[in-house]
Amino acid sequence: MSDALKHECGVAHIRLLKPLDYYKKKYGSTFYGINKMYLLMEKQHNRGQDGAGFASIKFDVEPGERYISRVRSVEQQPIQDVFSKINTRINDALDENPLLKDDVSLQKKHIPYIGEVMLGHVRYGTFGKNSVESVHPFLRQNNWKHRNLILAGNFNMTNVKDLFNNLVELGQHPKEYTDTITIMEKIGHFLDAQVRKIYKDLKKEGFTKSECSPLITKRLKLSKILKKSSKDWDGGYVIGGMIGHGDSFILRDPAGIRPAFYYKDDEVIVVASERPAIQTAFNLKLDQIKEVPPGNALLINKAGELNIKEILPPTEKKACSFERIYFSRGSDADIYKERKELGKLIMPTILKEINYDISNSVFSYIPNTAETSFYGMVESVDNYLINKKTNEILNNKNISKEQIVEVLSERARIEKIAIKDVKLRTFITEDSSRDDLVEHVYDITYGVIKKTDTLIIIDDSIVRGTTLKKSILKMLDRLGPKKIIVVSSAPQIRYPDCYGIDMANLESLIAFKALLSLLKQTNQYSLIDSTYKKCKKQELLPDSEITNYVKDLYSLFSAEEISTMITSLLSTDVTSAEVKIIFQSIENLHKACPNNLGDWYFTGNYPTNGGNRVVNNAFINFFEGNKKRAY
């Protein structure tokens, strides 16, 4: 992807179902769970590089002994830093007391991080500061085991303000205004309430205070707590939690916006945001891993029993299509096929644009995430050539051997043109100097482009277009092609996201800039004022009654008109070559990714009522010149 875009976080959860000495005997290590957690998190490092965290709970320890361990990091390589700290503590303990080496019970008693249930997180920050205090898992502590709550998740709520105010109305004083703290305190409130109720019931039944604790853990109903906690949530989420006594849960939003997968056998229960992470870490086949159903929670009690319960009624499934285009690892079998299909489906538009002149066209891609869609594009052009050659031979009954060789020798010219050279550090604040550095983020391969060539280069998506304008187009133009065609395997990104992607401002989106330019060009810019007034009028309406009026502005122009204006905005005064930017259609996106139909950033069709609130706020912020977040 050419535009830097922060996005989804990643969740990892392991529940060991056997005693720790089982793993020591079978796998040679008491630290089996920790090692698997490292793999799960490392295989999801694409989902978060701002921070990483790990927490574990030990079962059945004596009073006075620590049973919860947590470590978090915002270092340059946070996952490695987290597990380096864990390994250092383990190795130091083993060095200081050699008796621990072969005694699992002593290891559990004296070494932190060893536990039966673990929760990990990799973070990209879209809300809050990027400090270690902002890194999951979060911990809500209490002297009662069953009132300790550890929380980590991949989520963004659109109605944080309302949820925060609800807590204040309950008499609470949340320590931060963030969705994570708000969600944790919401769950914590109903956890406390249920514990108090169970305790009162047990006292009435004649149990002593010390007898109550273990009985509370057996009577606690996580499903009830989650139903009460989540009934007002509006957003996309996968939230993982652990209760101090050993219960744990994973809850997914009703529209299935955020992804979650799980696996269970007689040794372990595993949950992760991405399927390949589980496949690789546990050497599994595709069909052994299941998807967490939308609106449902995986509930794992201390006894190791897994139940899947509906917490919220599932709505129409709108799983995020950007997961398939860009965010998730391309090693997933289905995602790999879908990205190839995106490349295949856009090829007819490309062929039309080059007037079917394959001989004078060179095909390439922007590294690295567009590589798979590039393979699909190449496969499609190969299929076109096969049909063309077949027809040429069949339609010429007098064709000679030399002519057959000439026909068969036509091939698509495939070259590696763009090379991602450096990860730019913006340590220079002067705009002109920084822009010069941005221009060199990518390097190019010289000597393969002729002046008569059209260079076709595919990217997975175009969000803001900054790198395209300041670096990629200038760089490609140096090669001297007649024409440059930039292909986006995704449709035009027209609307802000509010479920975990760093695209909250309308005015930063190149498609919205193109819309504004078209309104000016066609003397319709006054519609901006009238749209602003409509948006202001509905500021105080309930989310369910808000209309997305920005859609009306886009409806004035065709997708082709907007693409042409995007081309003009990004290429004017930048290149000598003619430039054309082509975007995927919404229809082809849905064909390629039939199980991930969440397309609100392309269409403005938000899967929750809060989405319309966000786009309404985003337009008001744009009009008023307010840079604050829209939710």
Question: Where are the regions that the model predicts?
Answer:
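Conserved short alpha-helical segments that host acidic/polar catalytic motifs at enzyme active sites
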Residues: M1-P293, L299-V362, I366-P367, G376
